[in-house]
Amino acid sequence: ARRQRQMCIRDSRCAETAIITFMTFKELNITEPILKAIEEKGYAVPTPIQGEAIPAALAKRDILGCAQTGTGKTASFAIPIIQHLQMNKEAAKCRGIKALILKPTRELALQISECINDYSKYTQVRHGVIFGGVNQRPQVDMLHKGIDILVATPGRLLDLMNQGHIHLDKIQYFVLDEADRMLD
């Protein structure tokens, strides 16, 4: 027997609640290149946070997600962002950062960047990571080559924005990850 879960999505813009039953990532309408990457990581069934957040994000809804460490929060936002950028031909033509993911520390930013790399490896979506405590020249060079998704720590983001290396006028997706730790 296949494992089934149900979820309710409430949209603040309307009074209706949708009940969706799903079983696998494929049934969440993830595109083939991303599905292949997910399967290579050994995942078949979405976690509860993924099962709720991915369909809502694919429907272009705002998400406020709270879950314990290790429950798949990163995939909950990374997969829909990658898929939207991969499928949006207009976005592909437009140079500039289209998704910004803020993380409080270098270590967490690097972890997210690795996950994005894993999920996007069969797509044309380009990403990069910036953080302080290292020479900024390689990061600036990467930015100038062009990326779609930027993972950043706040300090380095502000530094490179103030120096004119980062422009956020093309941003379509914003993720504030570990928001509680940003305030520490």
Regions found by a protein language model. Give the residues of each.
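Single conserved hydrophobic/aromatic residue that forms the stacking wall/gate
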Residues: 1-11
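Short, positively charged and aromatic/hydrophobic N-terminal segments
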Residues: 10-19
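Conserved pre-motif I regulatory segment
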Residues: 22-66
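Conserved nucleic-acid-binding Ia/Ib motif block in the N-terminal RecA-like helicase ATPase lobe
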Residues: 27, 33-36, 40, 92-162, ...
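Walker A/P-loop NTP-binding motif
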Residues: 54-63, 75-92, 117-118, 158
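The conserved Walker
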Residues: 67-71
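Post-DEXD/H (motif II) to motif III coupling segment of the RecA-like Helicase ATP-binding lobe
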Residues: 167-168, 172-184
